[in-house]
A protein has these predicted regions:
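Carbohydrate-interacting regions of secretory-pathway proteins
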Residues: 25-278
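N-terminal secretory signal peptides that target proteins for export/translocation
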Residues: 1-7
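Bacterial N-terminal signal peptides
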Residues: 11-23
C-alpha cells in the first residue's frame, strides 16, 4: 500500500512539473509572438520602444539578381521597370509624343538628333538603377566622346560620358554631378562594356518659391561610391553656377541626347519611403 501511494505521489509530481513546464512554454511562445519588448525606452522623436515587437515588419521582397556583361540582372520585386529591353512604352519625346530612340537586342540606343526622352512616370525620392554603354569604336574627345546624361526632373544631372583614359573638366566626366561635383574616383569601364549607375536621389523641398530642404545624391558607379549624400546646389548648368528653381515633389527622369549613340538597358527604380511605411 505504501508503495502504491509513493507511485501515485510520483506521478502527481511529474504531472505538476509537466504542467508548469507547459505553462512556461506557452508564456514564452506568447511573448515571442511579438519578438520584442514593451518595457524598453522609447526611441527619440518617435513612438516605438527599443526592440519593439509591435513595430511593423518590413515588407519581404525578392532582391533580384546582378547583371553580367552579357545579361542584365533581374530587378527587385518591388521595382518599377522603366525599360526591360522590349519597347519604349514608359518613355516620351520632349514634345510629349512617342519616343523615337532605337530598340534593338534588349537595349535602347540614342538616335542622334532625335532629342532627349523622358519618363511618363513622375518620380520622387527614389533608388534608380540604370546601365549604359559607349560605342566600342571611339570617336571624338573630351565632352564629344559618348556624351549623354541622366537628369532627374530634367535638371539635376548625373553625367554619362566615355571617361576611360580620356580627360575632360572633372565636374563634367562620367558620374559627375554635372557642373558641381566630380566623382570621388573614376570608375569607368572600357568603351563597349556595360557601366552601372545606382543612384539614391532625395528631392529638394520647396514651400512656394522658398527652398526649405536641398536635394541629395548618393551614387555608385560600377559598385563604387562616387558621391556620398552630396548636397545639390541647384539645377545643373553649363558654364554657369547651379541654382534652384521651384518645382513639384515629383517629376520626370530625362535621358539626354547629346548627339552620341550611347546605349541603355535594365532601367528601374524603387520609391523610397520613410521607415514603417507599407
Amino acid at each position: 500500500m505504501k508503495s502504491t501511494v509513493k507511485t501515485w505521489a510520483g506521478v502527481g509530481l511529474l504531472l505538476t512539473l509537466g504542467a508548469g513546464f507547459g505553462a512556461a512554454l506557452t508564456a514564452r511562445a506568447q511573448q515571442q509572438e511579438h519578438f520584442g519588448y514593451q518595457d524598453t525606452p522609447i526611441l527619440p522623436g518617435g513612438k516605438w520602444h527599443v526592440h519593439d515587437g509591435t513595430r511593423p515588419q518590413p515588407k519581404v521582397i525578392d532582391p533580384g539578381s546582378f547583371s553580367s556583361q552579357e545579361t542584365p540582372g533581374k530587378p527587385p520585386s518591388d521595382a518599377i521597370v522603366l525599360f526591360d529591353g522590349k519597347d519604349l512604352s514608359h518613355w516620351k519625346a520632349g514634345n510629349g509624343g512617342p519616343a523615337t530612340w532605337t530598340v534593338q537586342d534588349g537595349m535602347m540606343v540614342i538616335a542622334p538628333k532625335a532629342g532627349s526622352i523622358a519618363t511618363k512616370d513622375e518620380i520622387g525620392d527614389c533608388q534608380l538603377h540604370i546601365e549604359w554603354s559607349e560605342p566600342t569604336t571611339v570617336t571624338g574627345r573630351d565632352q564629344g566622346r559618348g556624351n549623354s546624361g541622366v537628369l532627374f526632373f530634367g535638371r539635376y544631372e548625373i553625367q554619362v560620358l566615355d571617361s576611360f583614359e580620356s580627360k575632360t573638366y572633372p565636374d563634367g566626366q562620367a558620374s559627375a554631378i554635372y557642373g558641381t561635383y566630380p566623382p570621388l574616383v573614376n570608375a569607368t569601364r572600357k568603351p563597349g562594356e556595360w557601366q552601372v549607375y545606382d543612384i539614391l536621389f532625395t528631392v529638394p523641398r520647396f514651400e512656394g518659391d522658398k527652398l526649405v530642404k536641398p536635394g541629395y545624391f548618393t551614387v555608385l558607379h560600377n559598385g563604387v561610391v562616387v558621391h556620398n549624400h552630396a548636397e545639390l546646389l541647384g539645377d545643373s548648368n553649363h558654364r554657369a553656377l547651379p541654382s534652384y528653381h521651384p518645382h513639384p515633389p515629383k517629376g520626370s527622369l530625362v535621358l539626354q541626347d547629346h548627339g552620341n549613340p550611347v546605349r541603355y538597358r535594365n532601367i528601374w527604380y524603387r520609391e523610397l519611403k520613410d521607415y514603417d511605411q507599407p
